Amino acid sequence: MYVHVKVAVIYHSLTEQVCRLALAATDGAWDAGGEVRLRRLGQLVPLGEMHLRPDWVEVLRETECMPEASTADLEWADVALFGAATPYGAMLDHLTQFVDATVPLWRAGKLAEKVYGAFTPAAAVHGGQNGRLVSLTDVFHHWGGIVVPLRPCDPISRQIGHPEGTTLLARRGAPLAGELAAARSQGQRATETARALKAGRRLLADVA
């Protein structure tokens, strides 16, 4: 039975780390046969401040052709994976603004029964990665979503240290091969889980 699965990978990044994780998660979803929309959240940093960080400007230049995320992408998707940095262990304003805009969809019940997951970097070993993942998971619960963690017995999951989602240590620079493999595995597992859920619901509907 063929089951089409639509995946939205939505991220915010001023450095390459989150973008690389988002691309890896996208690859994993593709490997699992998903139709994927890779979307970036818009920038809230004033241009005057942006130009004080040439590395930020370079990332923006490289990703400016990528479509910005909208709540329509979330409504469209069977799977939504969110990625953003972890400033002081808190949720970025960019992500909070996007979540606030989903209220009409939430009230209409259009965010329930979807598969969700998250990934994040932080500058320090204990820089709040777990708190960020848990805070996003709380949002997914309020939406009525189905949260899919990493594979618990996969050595990759043990390597990155957080079963809730892919994390990395940003101060090392570019993501390590194991961190990218974890994001790829996360995208693949979320897509496979959504396909199984859709197939099961279809069978139940046929029986009914």
Where do the model's predicted regions map?
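Short, charged/polar low-complexity linear motifs in solvent-exposed/disordered segments
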Residues: 108, 130, 136, 145, ...
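Mobile beta-alpha loop/short-helix "lid" or hinge segments that flank ligand
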Residues: 41-46, 144-171
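N-terminal beta1-alpha1-beta2 submodule of the flavodoxin-like/Rossmannoid cofactor-binding fold
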Residues: 1-110, 169-208
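Short, glycine-/small-residue-rich phosphate/pyrophosphate-handling segment
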Residues: 112-158
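Noncatalytic linker/hinge segments flanking ATPase motor cores
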Residues: 48-52, 120-128, 155-163, 189-193
